[in-house]
Amino acid sequence: MAKTIQAIRGMNDCLPTETPVWQWVESKVRSTLASYGYSEIRMPIVENTPLFARAIGEVTDVVSKEMFTFNDRDNESLTLRPEGTAGCVRAGIEHGLLYNQEQRLWYMGPMFRYERPQKGRYRQFHQAGVEVFGIANAEIDAELIILTARLWKELGIEQHVTLQLNSIGSLEARANYRSALVEFLQQYVGLMNEEEKERLLKNPLRILDTKNEALQQALNNAPKLLDYLDDDSREHFARLCAILDNVGISYEINPKLVRGLDYYNKTVFEWVTTALGAQGTICGGGRYDGLVEQLGGHATCGVGFAMGLERLILLVQEVNKAIPLPQSAVDIYLIFAGENTASAAFRLAEKVRSELPHLRTMMHCSGGNFKKQFKRADKSGAKIALVLGESEVQNQQVVVKDLLGGAEQQTVALEAVIDHLKTSFKE
């Protein structure tokens, strides 16, 4: 027997028993974004490697350690996308969507990072992302946060997520803060592991979200980024907080929140939860006003967020016990037997699908006697079985059997079966 081939570690199948909750969550994401007037954009999952190196930052963990990168046959370096913002900006520049325009865009799909697989974090994972271009003021930052808060209500998780906010200011303000932070951290090098020492040299702000408990304690006395903000960033952040206060969105200001990608400036935010054990991020984002120009476009401000669907779905399943999922994949199961019944059965099945498209109709195609077919019908979870034998075909009739309610089966004229089904599924 040949050795079986299995999925790559950290890249998981989504089975038929799992897809209904995915479809429900995805539909809530789509409908919420549509209600705010956002438009879908779809980008390739493979991009030229320099796109991510330039956008995300050479010294970030994502670029230096986590990307799936390979050379194609022309020896060009390509990368499976680790996030969606860079590709969305690239598409916007390439197709002339950004210059002197406002755009509100969203996307959904797989991303790839070479991480150690664990619950809610995989090497192939899925994100829903939103990117807004051409709007500089704090109102759009607020809209994105209000939008996510509405989505949490739609998903039934609003009591289990907390909004954390920070402003990381301009590039100049951040450079000044970086110098002060490095000077402070020098006295704690002895507490750092090798990875943290490397971050101290290359990307010291990333030490602020360390999991090292001793270092976390020391960081309580570290300089605060908010104290180094430029006036424009300070006013922008104050305006955002005022809007959120006025519309009743609760938040915590987290001075250690910096996000893991280099392109952010001013506002950064995360929605976090403790309902899955240790605190985990469900959604994160912020402003990236220099990214479009950095990638070769005209100077255009931007702001966005992304949410990891695997972790979001884990949270939904953990705290929302009233998800309206279908109990089976089938509503009507059509069975038939006899020499000349197949054609009539196909015609009936198509008639039902045409006139009752909201009902899911499955036709038995694997043969066998009626007893065997009824077993399959019961196993399918269908509410109704439609039965055609030679006599029914000859008399233009169909037998309707209630598989769940125990009602007596009825013989119905073929021309009346649609009305009969409408009544059955209204009850």
Curated annotation (Swiss-Prot):
Description of how the protein assembles with itself and partners: Homodimer.
Disulphide connectivity of cysteines: none
Keywords assigned: Aminoacyl-tRNA synthetase, ATP-binding, Cytoplasm, Ligase, Nucleotide-binding, Protein biosynthesis
Positions of transmembrane segments: none
Protein name: Histidine--tRNA ligase
GO molecular function annotations of the record: ATP binding; histidine-tRNA ligase activity
InterPro entries: aa-tRNA-synth_II (IPR006195), aa-tRNA-synth_II/BPL/LPL (IPR045864), Anticodon-bd (IPR004154), Anticodon-bd_dom_sf (IPR036621), His-tRNA-ligase (IPR015807), HisRS-like_core (IPR041715), HisRS/HisZ (IPR004516), HisRS_anticodon (IPR033656)
Compartments, as annotated in UniProt: Cytoplasm
Domain of life: Bacteria
E.C. numbers: 6.1.1.21
Pfam families reported for this sequence: HGTP_anticodon, tRNA-synt_His
Family per similarity comment: Belongs to the class-II aminoacyl-tRNA synthetase family.
Lineage: Bacteria, Pseudomonadati, Pseudomonadota, Gammaproteobacteria, Pasteurellales
Gene Ontology, cellular component aspect: cytoplasm
Main location: cytoplasm
GO biological process, one term: histidyl-tRNA aminoacylation
Catalytic activity: tRNA(His) + L-histidine + ATP = L-histidyl-tRNA(His) + AMP + diphosphate + H(+)
Organism: Mannheimia succiniciproducens (strain KCTC 0769BP / MBEL55E)
